[in-house]
Amino acid sequence: MAGVSSESLATALAALEAKLPTASLQLAKELFGILGMVDSSAGLRRALTDPSRNGDEKSALVRQLVGGKVSADAAEVAGGLAGSRWASARDIGDALETLAATVVISVAENKSAVSASGITGLEELENDLFSFNQAVASSHEVQRALSEPQASGAAKAALAEKLVPGVSEEAKVLITQAVTQPRGIKATRLVERFAELAAKRQQRWIATVSVTRPLTSTQLSRLQAGLNALYGRELKVNINVDPALIGGIRVQVGDEVLDASVISRLGELQRQLAG
């Protein structure tokens, strides 16, 4: 998303920020529901991107469609998006998805207590999303089931819950959305996007590190320090053990993939891990 759509999303996120301290998962579910309505109606998408309609008309149209069906906050957020300028119909859907996910992430962030393991609600959410994707990656049968176009959303949601039964309510909302309404991409890729939004919320990136064998605590600390220095910021590091990996180590940060063959960037990390 770029240009006018990016500006509209930034404006919407800024407006949403005022609602986040008291927002609940219900608001997120309502926004995801409105997203489903937009995605399922080509006529509505055309109306929302029709250059001959002004912003007030588009906003009023959406408020009329959702009025009485969702909360006032959800209607306000959706109406505000509709009244903004978008380069494409896809962009307004992506924006709704981002706002809904941001609400879920904020609910996790606002949890006052930490879990028994000592991690925050936001960290718990990230870990739960990562665990789901690992569970899917480990089973070709599950991957086929989640991508089966004839399977119902309810069946896919039930399967997801069986894969990771102990996840937080926040993670459950995002995972359910990803498997029932992936919007043309793999469910696991959408879960990754949600995890990236969660990491961005706490001003960190996610580094998925694949290694041939488990790291010791010392090696993990060195890896964390090396990656932080390499990127100039604190990263959230997830470790994936893959005995079949060629090269010893593979690091992915966002869309950037670094293999051990990139000696100029990972050579120092390899030396640190060998120490």
From Swiss-Prot:
It is a peripheral membrane protein. One of its GO terms (molecular function) is proton-transporting ATP synthase activity, rotational mechanism. The keyword Cell membrane applies. Keywords: ATP synthesis, Cell membrane, CF(1), Hydrogen ion transport, Ion transport, Membrane, Transport. GO terms for cellular component: plasma membrane; proton-transporting ATP synthase complex. Coiled coil: none annotated. It is found in: Cell membrane. F-type ATPases have 2 components, F(1) - the catalytic core - and F(0) - the membrane proton channel. F(1) has five subunits: alpha(3), beta(3), gamma(1), delta(1), epsilon(1). F(0) has three main subunits: a(1), b(2) and c(10-14). The alpha and beta chains form an alternating ring which encloses part of the gamma chain. F(1) is attached to F(0) by a central stalk formed by the gamma and epsilon chains, while a peripheral stalk is formed by the delta and b chains. Belongs to the ATPase delta chain family. NCBIfam families: ATP_synt_delta, PRK13430.1. F(1)F(0) ATP synthase produces ATP from ADP in the presence of a proton or sodium gradient. F-type ATPases consist of two structural domains, F(1) containing the extramembraneous catalytic core and F(0) containing the membrane proton channel, linked together by a central stalk and a peripheral stalk. During catalysis, ATP synthesis in the catalytic domain of F(1) is coupled via a rotary mechanism of the central stalk subunits to proton translocation. This is ATP synthase subunit delta.
